[in-house]
Amino acid sequence: MRILGIDPGLRTTGFGVLEKHGNKLSYIASGTIKSNGETDLPARLKTLFDGISEVARTYTPDCAAIEKVFVNVNPQSTLLLGQARGAAICGLVGQGLPVFEYTALQLKVAVVGYGRANKEQVQEMVMRLLSLPGRPSTDAADALGVAICHANGGDTLGTLSGLAPELVRKGMRVRRGRLIG
């Protein structure tokens, strides 16, 4: 199964492509789609839509996983990010892909094993899990991370993450989508 991960952003959107064969994950590609911050919003959204569509056509994934929007302190930023995410989802659906959504917490638990991991920890673990020669950019690492989350059964992580405080008290944690103790 080939998975396209997306970390949406209005200026920079990360993408990452993985192949899953059984329990093995193989890196295919990653990068960023950049929009010119000087152009108007509709033009930036079109750049994002076109870029996502092109990535999907180039790498022919079976499905896509995208990071959910978090509510920011600044409501205007949250609305803009939501519009970028919408453009990305439309680009994916336009290519006939099923789209799965994951929170930043689910991504971090799947990749690092800790929901409050910082960007550098996510980059480091993505590099190690995929045997990359160097750290990917933060946007590409998050995109690869959301693809890893989906590949490792991310749909069950939401349920396990909600149990995190109780599991920690019992000395257990979620690691790469599995409960360990």
Curated annotation (Swiss-Prot):
Its cofactor is Mg(2+). The active site is at D7, E67, D139. Binds 2 Mg(2+) ion per subunit. One of its GO terms (molecular function) is magnesium ion binding. It catalyses: Endonucleolytic cleavage at a junction such as a reciprocal single-stranded crossover between two homologous DNA duplexes (Holliday junction). InterPro entries: RNaseH-like_sf, RNaseH_sf, X-over_junc_endoDNase_Mg_BS, X-over_junc_endoDNase_RuvC. GO terms for biological process: DNA recombination; DNA repair. It is found in: Cytoplasm. Mg(2+) 2 binds at E67. Its EC number is 3.1.21.10. Mg(2+) 1 binds at D7, D139. One of its GO terms (cellular component) is Holliday junction resolvase complex. Belongs to the RuvC family. The RuvA-RuvB-RuvC complex processes Holliday junction (HJ) DNA during genetic recombination and DNA repair. Endonuclease that resolves HJ intermediates. Cleaves cruciform DNA by making single-stranded nicks across the HJ at symmetrical positions within the homologous arms, yielding a 5'-phosphate and a 3'-hydroxyl group; requires a central core of homology in the junction. The consensus cleavage sequence is 5'-(A/T)TT(C/G)-3'. Cleavage occurs on the 3'-side of the TT dinucleotide at the point of strand exchange. This is Crossover junction endodeoxyribonuclease RuvC. The gene is ruvC.
